[in-house]
């Protein structure tokens, strides 16, 4: 055993002294209660630091806590020691040495390396014929940094030896992430083999889906028992849905649903409501065929098109990746690549673009000491810690260094030299941000746009105090709907984070070339001749912008003026312009045969973008607003009884749901109220309540019981319901709105019944045709908006409005036929030049293909 201060740059590192077995045992006695043997289910981190991308390959090695089994690099192990008092760590180090050369100058014959025992990936950039690995393990005792070499059966207590062996033999908590093996991590649903499917004649079209209970047209799930199409859960950015798919399961007990838009020949995203997780359905093709979706035909069709499709799209791959061009590798801060974990390029491209934005750099990397110091005991399960870790890894330059002796090698090898690319592996980050998500937890390719919105949700949910970097993307969209029959209008606003531009194929400027190409291609196919060179449709950006601003028909529009369904027309404008504008070109669609298709187009995206002409103007002179009346509510006969049973006694609050919400960072009392007012329906439903009410002044106030039945009048004085303004108690309003009724309905019903909850519910059921008091509603909304503004003052405006003039600074491109396949790369303009980020490879771009992008990132030009 030796005391090695040299590990930490301390003197005396070369000295060592042998100690008797009794001395080692005596040294470990105070720490024995803290040394654990890993149990089944314990995650043992041996490959990567929780705060950095240090590994056993790093210069300082890796320290594994023998109690928590978390790993830390040399720079961060002291922080964990100070925070937890854990003193015993296993130090792991892998040495890479050049093999001894033979007399002829070549390497000696390759021998089995008996000194490799760590479960680590080898460096693909090192020739195994020239280099060999040697792994080293030691116990280190803090704070004096005593070292005990391993193995040491003779001197170590039996418990310590068992614990060390268990740590060394444990597998990584992250399985080998490739498309084939990751899929096996999803369990097969126990309902798949004997799933009941109703013979109700339902057939699902390949497009035009809409939730059966609301007007949402995204995040839709097909129930595999009865063919119902319903929306998923709600997210911060107003995407997601109203949770009707889950409600349908609770009403019917039909357990399995598949997400529309994810169905490919290789599978789809299937969720089991009963099992509460993403699952595999081995009979998915049969279950989908029941509703007219023929996956086997899709597979045959894709294979039939494969030979014809791949060749034309080779040029797309070559152009976007700048194949055939000698690209200069880039190193240093901001030029770090991300290794591909197996179809993780969508994540890598989005994160490279995100951390090129100063607001995200400041929020995370700028707050690194504070975030790391106040991280939870398990930092691998904390979003802000992992975002900061990733941001530091990308921006520090610590993991993007030129290869050793690169200048000398380049002189000797010239153009034959292949530069070494370091890069970092986002395995821990991906595992955290994708957990419990049916799409991103798989290792199939995903849509970069969907991941961008998912990331924004997480940033919103885990914002650091008053700082919310995703504010730079947020903007307000004004939607104007006009009743075609009465010509009256309604103006509403919603929050969004990106601008979706349709592809105006009819505006292609090379139609004659496209027609000639299509004729030649078909002739070549029929005669089995080589296909002609691809002709790509050239679409003016102005045409896409025009298509975005044109009116669109609204299906199933309910006119409050007619109090009936009518034809409606909707136009969208910007009520505010964001600091950073994200533009998505909607290149993907489905054919009538359910095969995902991609518009292979070239859009002349501008470097400078002016959208000031799309600024919303609100109600115009001469326009008459539609009455503010909600459509009548159709309620099943048993709904009242079922809803009343949701009211629970405070002593029966589900504390497990409360703790789940509290672990997300919400105030404990707010979590208790959320679970209570949603009738113990679970953490997910309670989370939605929190989102709706988190801006209210009494959000974190303790739970106080509203009145029930005859006790309502007694409770009214507590909540101020009998005040001069007849304001209903907010808690009672929350109970009714949590049942699915509109807030305005709840207020009107409570005012009409002196805030008696039971009578208010009776009033709602007996007055489905009631008209809301518009003046009161407007006053309430103004008060709510005033509260939001006053709450937002410390953190700045929630919407960063300004000029609509922008300049392009990044874009993400997709290669392939579908978002569920292919590859993503990112181009970012840094220091006046374009740089391509292609997984772990970072190079100066010679010809950035700005016309072939999928997502574009613009920053506002200061006026």
Swiss-Prot record:
EC number: 3.4.19.12
The UniProt record lists the keyword Membrane: no
GO BP of this protein: autophagy; cell population proliferation; maintenance of unfolded protein; positive regulation of ERAD pathway; protein K29-linked deubiquitination; protein K6-linked deubiquitination; protein K63-linked deubiquitination; protein stabilization
Top-tier EC class: hydrolase
Active site per UniProt: 345 (nucleophile), 823 (proton acceptor)
GO cellular component: cytosol; nucleus
Regulation of its function: Specifically inhibited by spautin-1 (specific and potent autophagy inhibitor-1), a derivative of MBCQ that binds to USP13 and inhibits deubiquitinase activity. Regulated by PIK3C3/VPS34-containing complexes. The weak deubiquitinase activity in vitro suggests the existence of some mechanism that activates the enzyme.
Principal localisation: cytoplasm
Localization, UniProt: Cytoplasm
Catalytic activity: Thiol-dependent hydrolysis of ester, thioester, amide, peptide and isopeptide bonds formed by the C-terminal Gly of ubiquitin (a 76-residue protein attached to proteins as an intracellular targeting signal)
Modified residues (Phosphothreonine): 122
Modified residues (Phosphoserine): 114
USP domain boundaries: 336-861
Keyword vocabulary terms for this entry: Autophagy, Cytoplasm, Hydrolase, Isopeptide bond, Metal-binding, Phosphoprotein, Protease, Repeat, Thiol protease, Ubl conjugation, Ubl conjugation pathway, Zinc, Zinc-finger
Cross-link position per record: Glycyl lysine isopeptide (Lys-Gly) (interchain with G-Cter in SUMO2): 311, 405
Binding-site residues for Zn(2+), renumbered to this chain: 211, 214, 231, 244
MF terms in GO: BAT3 complex binding; cysteine-type deubiquitinase activity; cysteine-type endopeptidase activity; K48-linked deubiquitinase activity; proteasome binding; protein-folding chaperone binding; ubiquitin binding; ubiquitin protein ligase binding
UniProt domain UBA: residue ranges: 652-693, 727-767
One Pfam short name: zf-UBP
Function description: Deubiquitinase that mediates deubiquitination of target proteins such as BECN1, MITF, SKP2 and USP10 and is involved in various processes such as autophagy, endoplasmic reticulum-associated degradation (ERAD), cell cycle progression or DNA damage response. Component of a regulatory loop that controls autophagy and p53/TP53 levels: mediates deubiquitination of BECN1, a key regulator of autophagy, leading to stabilize the PIK3C3/VPS34-containing complexes. Alternatively, forms with NEDD4 a deubiquitination complex, which subsequently stabilizes VPS34 to promote autophagy.
Domain free text: The UBP-type zinc finger has lost its ability to bind ubiquitin and USP13 is not activated by unanchored ubiquitin. The UBA domains mediate binding to ubiquitin.
Name of the featured protein: Ubiquitin carboxyl-terminal hydrolase 13
